[in-house]
A protein has these predicted regions:
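N-terminal, Lys/Arg-enriched amphipathic/low-complexity engagement segments
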Residues: 1-55, 70-73
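Generic structural motif
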Residues: 41-42, 46-50, 62-65, 74-96
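Acidic, glycine-anchored pre-beta loop/turn
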Residues: 56-62, 101-102
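Short, surface-exposed secondary-structure boundary micro-motifs
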Residues: 67, 73-74, 99, 116
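Hydrophobic or amphipathic alpha-helical targeting/insertion segments
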Residues: 84-121
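Phosphate/diphosphate-binding glycine-rich loops and adjacent basic-rich segments that engage nucleotide
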Residues: 120-156, 165-169, 174-180, 244-263
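Hydrophobic alpha-helical positions that pack around
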Residues: 153, 214-263
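Histidine-anchored nucleotide/phosphate-binding helix
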Residues: 194-210
Length: 263
């Protein structure tokens, strides 16, 4: 009886979530109000087993988005595969480098920052990044500075820069993009696809340029309409790189993993 009740609750919660996302075409625009604490603690380990090295010290002033911890390297000078640079989410002053308990229960180092000063990005109009005039090497360096990681794998996250470096010299590269939810209980991918497709498309092109991909394959849910639904021409987005859009029947689970997409 208890197990049946849990299933009933989960199904109803899923139904409510689906209903909300269908009624509001772009719910992301509503999520604009946030709480800013006076002091924050940022762990130097963002992925289990990979602790970054702090590049700031107590008393330092930091800007919003400034790198405060860099990727640790092994004895041979190679970067840790799962690590990426850590940035300050707020402007302020570093009060101390201290030990803290991570969300996984382990102890480790962290940077404590007291909120102070003006924001660089929050609430400000962003400048357009002139990425089309960047070389693949410059784009990869920018990605490294941005601390971009790949969250596709459920088991662990990895540095996008290091993953790109591992495969960019291979031949006959096809870039496969999934624009639907791998897990139907988490609708983040589909929500972002509807609300931020132009930005996603730009990211796809940047990735293809870095990899020198000879084809882009975009997998999307069968009931979705892309790219016509967002009023964008494929040639405008991806230039001379051939693009193939493939419908995926998302009624069956799993359908969005690496193996399923390749099949």
């Amino acid at each position: 009886m208890v197990w049946q009740s849990i299933i009933w609750v989960k199904r109803n919660a899923m139904a409510m979530l689906t209903d909300i996302t269908k009624k509001d075409k772009n719910p992301v625009q509503r999520m604009t109000t946030g709480f800013l604490p006076a002091k924050i603690t940022i762990p130097l380990c963002q992925e289990d087993g990979f602790e970054c090295t702090s590049s700031v010290k107590p008393g330092d002033s930091v800007r919003e988005g400034q790198v405060i911890a860099d990727v640790s390297r092994d004895e041979y000078g190679s970067k840790s595969f799962g690590a990426a640079k850590i940035h300050s989410p707020i402007p302020g002053t570093v009060t101390e480098i201290k030990s803290c308990t991570y969300p996984n229960g382990k102890q480790g180092k962290a940077v404590e920052i007291f909120l102070n000063g003006s924001f660089t990005y929050l609430g400000k109009q962003q400048t357009v990044f002139d990425w089309k005039n960047y070389s693949p090497a410059m784009l990869l360096r920018t990605i490294s500075e941005g601390g971009v990681i790949n969250t596709f794998s459920n088991s662990s996250y990895s540095s996008f820069e290091i993953e790109m470096n591992k495969i960019k010299d291979e031949k006959d590269k096809k870039l496969v993009i999934r624009l639907f939810d791998e897990d139907p209980s988490c609708q983040a991918d589909s929500i972002l696809t509807r609300s931020e497709f132009e930005k996603i498309a730009t990211g796809i092109y940047i990735s293809a340029k870095i990899l020198d991909a000879n084809e882009i394959i975009i997998a999307y849910a069968k009931n979705a309409k892309l790219p016509a639904a967002v009023g964008i021409e494929t040639k405008e987005l991806f230039g001379s790189i051939p693009v193939t859009f493939i419908e995926i029947d998302t009624r069956f689970y799993p359908c969005g993993g690496k193996r399923e997409l390749i099949k």
